Design a protein with these regions (language model features):
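ATP-binding N-terminal substructure of ATP-dependent carboxylate-amine bond-forming enzymes
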Residues: 1-103
Length: 104
């Protein structure tokens, strides 16, 4: 089981906290992150892997997140900015259909 933290930015302590906790329950678990510019994101640099994404307001953002989850065995999404909440809630059923829980 893996976790995805979206719009990771500078949330290094959040990524590290999830890395520590997931290993207790899922030794092979990974914490992935997304950001519009992951090479400049300190949280992306400490994550087990990262993905470049478009802004949440752009077309196909949700489709891309779903594909990332399916391709990388991601079961939980942790959003970190307010603008992600409504699109994630509105698409909660789509995520659930592929076995992903949105933390909203």
């Amino acid at each position: 089981m893996n976790i995805l933290i979206t719009s990771a930015g500078r949330r290094v302590s959040l990524v590290r906290a999830f890395q520590k906790e997931i290993k207790q329950y899922f030794p092979d678990g990974k914490v992935y992150t997304t950001d519009v510019n992951p090479k400049l994101s300190s949280a992306c640099q400490v994550a087990d892997g990262f993905f470049k994404v478009n802004k949440v307001t752009e077309d196909r953002y949700i489709d891309y997140l779903i594909r990332l989850c399916v391709d990388n065995n991601i079961k939980i999404i942790i959003p970190t900015i307010d603008t992600e909440l409504i699109p994630l809630v509105c698409n909660r059923d789509r995520f659930a259909d592929v076995g992903v829980h949105c933390g909203v």
